[in-house]
């Protein structure tokens, strides 16, 4: 019922948006233009992009046609059109931590700074970067010296989904540290009939190869590890075989091996989310987007029983992982000014607030603080906002040859989960690091591809780590 109310409120809000348009920009200056974009499949396409495209066309006279494809197909189609300098491609949707380095290095994305400064194209109240959350801004540039070639608009977050009802029933402390996380997973692995097949598993996360890099990132950095490090001479080398990184691999592997169902070894995020919604796990490490499935009374057995908190801190601190999504303009577009007008319109305060109300986590501060916005749960709102403000988007190793390097990191994780011996993990990490260094030496000469590293992030303090738990009234459990 609550989800339906949120959707209805969002629909009513969307119908009245045109009256909010900024008067200092002539929104109809490119009337009759058609823009083409290639976007990837996501919940926000139907929840926000399609209704907004209709509003945009009504207000500006510009038609937006976007082809929506699953990730691999989208990337292939974008690559073909960009490599061919196809002028028919205007708008590019991308995650900078996944595609930004490659497309920036190739020179495929337009520098947006001149458009941002043009008062005829950008509303005077646009408030960039002032109204953008810090973590989102950290993700826009992945190569040092990179031009401002994208506008980040949405920030999903890798959070810990928890069954609040089970934590209350068994009086288990809601975790703020990695040690407490494992303790909670142990206590909430529930085998009621003693047959060795738990009715509820304590923990669930991605457990298959390269896909684990996205969910593993927060654990890696919280333990003090990293994908890469910089030598004194400035060269970039792999760091996945450092003590801290191997500690993280070992911990994450043990959590999957000891407290998750065997299907986690091959599941993709949708399958894990479905298991959690079916009541088969007490905790799920996944994007905050999946809360919608867990809270849907038509699809979930745990509707009203789940919320989200930040991934617990490690010995190095807490670095929330926020896979952000950006909009960019093809360098070869024939409609660059009209394309920027679309981006500027879509990322105005009132338009992004509409997305926020349609359950799409936005990168504007005002979207979170507006008095009319009500999050799905208090803890979901707090954890998602804190992650977007403090987080870093380095779910995947920042490199041109990102696919190859994710595969190598995935092999280390496979050993961590299936074998678990420290010596075996270290040996695989050493082997992977050597191969990664060879790849980087061939593909990234002359580049400072540092990405949004923890050293650039704001330090998350203990009170922030605890804030979502307090917001849900769960902070006194386990005492």
Give the location of each predicted region.
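Extracytoplasmic/periplasmic solute-binding protein
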Residues: 137-153, 158, 182-237, 281
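Short, solvent-exposed loop/beta-turn-alpha elements that line the ligand-binding surface or hinge
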Residues: 28, 113-131, 193-194, 202-203, ...
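Short, well-ordered beta-strand elements
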Residues: 31-43, 62-67, 90-91
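Long, aromatic- and glycine/proline-rich binding clefts that accommodate carbohydrate-like moieties
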Residues: 128-131, 137-141, 304-310, 357-417, ...
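Extracytoplasmic "Venus flytrap"/periplasmic binding protein-like
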Residues: 51, 55-132, 165-176, 274-275, ...
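Mature extracytoplasmic/periplasmic domains
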Residues: 55, 273, 289-297, 325-404, ...
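Glycine-centered hinge/linker elements that transmit conformational signals in sensory
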Residues: 184-187, 231-265, 307, 311
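Hinge/lid segment of periplasmic solute-binding proteins
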Residues: 24-29, 99-157, 215, 219, ...
């Amino acid at each position: 019922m609550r989800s339906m109310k949120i959707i209805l409120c969002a629909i009513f809000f969307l119908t009245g948006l045109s009256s909010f348009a900024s008067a200092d920009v002539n929104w109809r200056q490119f009337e009759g233009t058609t823009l083409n974009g290639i976007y990837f499949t996501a919940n926000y396409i139907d929840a926000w992009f399609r209704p907004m495209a209709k509003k945009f066309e009504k207000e500006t006279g510009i038609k937006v046609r976007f082809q929506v494809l699953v990730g691999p197909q989208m990337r292939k189609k974008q690559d073909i059109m960009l490599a061919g300098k196809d002028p028919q491609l205007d708008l590019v949707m991308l995650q900078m931590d996944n595609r930004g380095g490659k497309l920036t290095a190739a020179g495929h994305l337009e520098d947006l700074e001149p458009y941002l400064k043009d008062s005829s194209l950008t509303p005077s109240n646009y408030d960039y970067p002032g109204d953008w959350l810090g973590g989102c801004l950290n993700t826009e540039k992945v190569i040092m010296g990179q031009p401002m070639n994208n506008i980040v608009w949405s920030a999903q977050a890798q959070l810990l989904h928890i069954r609040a009802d089970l934590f209350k029933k068994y009086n288990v402390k809601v975790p703020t540290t990695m040690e407490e996380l494992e303790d909670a997973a142990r206590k909430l692995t529930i085998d009621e009939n003693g047959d060795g097949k738990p009715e509820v598993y304590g923990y669930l996360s991605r457990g298959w190869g390269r896909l684990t890099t996205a969910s593993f990132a927060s654990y890696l950095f919280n333990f003090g590890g990293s994908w890469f490090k910089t030598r004194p001479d400035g060269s970039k080398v792999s760091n996945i075989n450092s003590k801290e990184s191997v500690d993280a691999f070992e911990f994450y592997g043990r959590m999957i091996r000891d407290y998750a169902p065997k299907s986690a070894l091959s599941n993709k995020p949708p399958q894990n989310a479905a298991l959690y919604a079916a009541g088969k796990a007490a905790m799920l490490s996944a994007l905050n987007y999946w809360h919608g499935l867990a809270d849907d009374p038509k699809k979930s057995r745990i509707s009203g029983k789940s919320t989200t908190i930040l991934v617990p801190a490690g010995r190095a601190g807490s670095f929330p992982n926020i896979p952000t999504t950006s909009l960019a303009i093809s360098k070869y577009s024939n409609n660059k000014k009209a394309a920027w007008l679309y981006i500027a319109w879509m990322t105005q305060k009132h338009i992004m607030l509409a997305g926020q109300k349609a359950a799409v986590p936005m990168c504007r501060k005002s979207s979170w603080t507006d008095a009319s916005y009500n999050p799905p749960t208090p803890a979901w709102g707090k954890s998602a906002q804190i992650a977007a403000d403090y987080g870093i988007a380095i779910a995947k190793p920042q490199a041109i040859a990102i696919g190859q390097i994710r595969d190598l990191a995935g092999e280390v994780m496979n050993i961590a989960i299936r074998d678990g011996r420290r010596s075996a993990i270290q040996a695989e990490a050493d082997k992977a690091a050597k191969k990664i260094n060879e790849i980087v030496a061939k593909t990234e000469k002359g580049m400072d591809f540092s990405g949004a590293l923890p050293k650039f992030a704001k330090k998350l303090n203990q009170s922030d780590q605890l804030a979502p738990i307090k917001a849900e009234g769960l902070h006194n459990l386990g005492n």
